[in-house]
From Swiss-Prot:
This is External core antigen. May regulate immune response to the intracellular capsid in acting as a T-cell tolerogen, by having an immunoregulatory effect which prevents destruction of infected cells by cytotoxic T-cells. This immune regulation may predispose to chronicity during perinatal infections and prevent severe liver injury during adult infections. Belongs to the orthohepadnavirus precore antigen family. HAMAP family: HBV_HBEAG. It comes from Hepatitis B virus genotype D subtype ayw (isolate France/Tiollais/1979). The keyword Metal-binding does not apply. The keyword Disulfide bond applies. One of its GO terms (biological process) is symbiont entry into host cell. Homodimerizes. Residues 184-212 form a propeptide.
Length: 212
């Protein structure tokens, strides 16, 4: 398996720090968190169950449909675009290597072990990474982090003391458990109309009438 890791490092041409984190940090057990610079952590992502994340194929289709022009552009758009570019490239290289191993590895048991490892371990990490950056581009990074915190609070709360349904990212601003810091906008409630004060002339006439 170490040889598999080494082949992946060699075949995955990753010129940026973000991609180096992806390849080296996860594979060699280095204490490198690819989400920290974006305000999140691997632990925060781990609160979401594995079946929460769409398949890599669906995520790649989503990224292509929404951000293809920006991803293919030679310009620097944002750190999320850069991370997506490198993740997509690394996934392509990983699939190429997995195909090569599947063709050239004669032992069926070893071949199945490699395929299972890629799908179970690397596949989940790529699904998490792709989902995170696509969601940050779609909903905003602060909203996504807020959602991860809210889901973490929800999942760790005993069922008897939490809402029946988990938070939903697309409706987070209305249903979030954890609100952004800062003053919340005050709602203006319609105040009852004040009775217009009577003019001095009117009050004087009334006082004269009362004296008569």
């Amino acid at each position: 398996m170490q040889l598999f890791h080494l082949c992946l490092i060699i075949s995955c041409s990753c010129p940026t720090v973000q991609a180096s984190k992806l390849c080296l940090g996860w594979l060699w057990g280095m204490d490198i968190d690819p989400y920290k610079e974006f305000g999140a952590t691997v632990e925060l992502l781990s609160f979401l169950p594995s079946d929460f994340f769409p398949s890599v194929r669906d995520l790649l289709d989503t990224a292509s449909a929404l951000y293809r022009e920006a991803l293919e552009s030679p310009e620097h758009c944002s750190p999320h675009h850069t991370a997506l570019r490198q993740a997509i490239l690394c996934w392509g290289e990983l699939m190429t290597l997995a195909t090569w191993v599947g063709v050239n590895l004669e032992d069926p048991a070893s071949r199945d072990l490699v395929v299972s490892y890629v799908n179970t371990n690397m596949g989940l990490k790529f699904r998490q990474l792709l989902w995170f950056h696509i969601s940050c581009l779609t909903f905003g990074r602060e909203t996504v982090i807020e959602y991860l915190v809210s889901f973490g609070v929800w999942i760790r709360t005993p069922p008897a003391y939490r809402p029946p349904n988990a938070p939903i990212l697309s409706t987070l601003p209305e249903t979030t458990v954890v609100r952004r810091r800062g003053r919340s906008p005050r709602r203006r409630t319609p105040s009852p109309r004040r009775r217009r004060s009577q003019s001095p002339r009117r009050r004087r006439s009334q006082s004269r009438e009362s004296q008569c």
